[in-house]
A protein has these predicted regions:
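Glycine-rich beta-strand-centered segment in the early N-terminal region that forms part
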Residues: 1-15, 27-68
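Cytochrome P450 core scaffold surrounding the K-helix E-X-X-R motif
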Residues: 19-25
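NAD(P)H dinucleotide-binding glycine-rich loop of Rossmann-like/cofactor-binding domains
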Residues: 22, 61-128
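Mid-domain Rossmann-like dinucleotide-binding core that forms the NAD(H)/NADP(H) cofactor-binding site
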Residues: 102-174
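C-terminal hydrophobic helical "lid"/dimerization subdomain
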Residues: 252-288
């Protein structure tokens, strides 16, 4: 039976993130207490409410945040779900896209807006541009008139990234800084966003203008970041880290509501989306 203030939610869709796989394999920054259910986010439908619940009703769709989403049903305090606007009967495509709202699109929005005040016509550079976060950065930047230099590690990705709204696509390598300068006609670059670490981070930092900001949110290369102190001293490069879990812990509720209020309508309207590769049932975990 439900405790006072709890709701029962049927899980409609929940994505598989690289961080989930890292956590399962014991390689993530924080180890969960066992037994633990993986999963970071998703979308569900309220199927039962308890006394004391006023803002959620049976049949309402909600975003799942806070972990443990790889299951058929979740029982949790009503306050731990984010209510969605009335969507009628959304398509399975919209349900899938909404299930990915709370991690990657939110990360992209916050990194795009929290560190540097970019204006229409400004440039940014980011690595792992073909990742899910990278795709959302491209789409959100395009909607704001911000131009993107999109760094990838292999050929054959330019067409997809340009179709999302990317302006320049470059392959990472030793001459990347010169490539960026050439492709953008030496445009000032105030923001770099990196998920790779190692030499890629350094090259992005070297491409920034004086006072530019580097934001690190991943280390896909497994390599530490090296920066010549001269870049910090003479170019006044700032280095910031971004971890979404910390934002969820510390951001005021009004800030969270404002962020979701920007993202959800874009996803529902189809203006913001990610590619879905494969679909699995919970019992199909071995195939996944």
């Amino acid at each position: 039976a439900l405790q006072n203030g709890e709701v029962r939610v049927k899980v409609l869709a929940t994505p598989i993130h690289p961080s989930n796989l890292l956590q399962i394999s014991g390689l993530y920054g924080i180890a969960p207490e066992l037994p633990s259910t993986p999963g970071s986010e998703g979308v569900g439908e309220v199927i039962e409410t308890s006394s004391g619940v006023t803002h959620l009703v049976v049949g309402q769709q909600v975003l799942l945040i806070g972990g443990g989403t790889w299951r058929d049903q979740i029982i949790a305090p009503a306050a731990s779900f984010i209510p969605l606007p009335d969507l009628g009967t959304p398509s399975s495509e919209i349900i899938e896209q909404l299930s990915m709202t709370a991690v990657n699109p939110l990360s992209a929005l916050l990194m795009l807006t929290s560190f540097v005040d970019l204006e229409e016509g400004d440039w940014l550079v980011h690595s792992a541009a073909n990742s899910a976060v990278g795709g959302y950065i491209i789409q959100l930047a395009k909607q704001r008139g911000i131009k993107t230099v999109n760094i990838v590690r292999r050929e054959g990705l330019a067409e997809d990234l340009m179709s999302k709204g990317g302006d320049v696509v470059l392959i990472d390598g030793p001459d990347l800084v010169a490539q960026i300068a050439s492709a953008t006609d030496n445009a000032p670059m105030a923001l770099g966003i990196d998920a790779v670490g190692g030499k890629t981070f350094t090259r992005l930092a070297q491409s920034l203008n004086n006072g530019g900001t580097m934001v690190s949110y991943g280390v896909m290369s497994g390599k530490p970041v090296t920066l010549n102190p001269a870049m910090l001293i003479f170019n006044d490069i700032r280095v910031r880290g971004f971890w979404l879990s910390k934002w969820f812990e510390t951001a005021p509720m009004a800030e969270k509501q404002a962020a979701f209020g920007q993202i959800i309508p874009l996803i529902v309207s189809g203006a913001l989306s990610a590619n879905v590769d494969s679909r699995f049932t919970v019992s199909g975990i071995k195939q996944a």
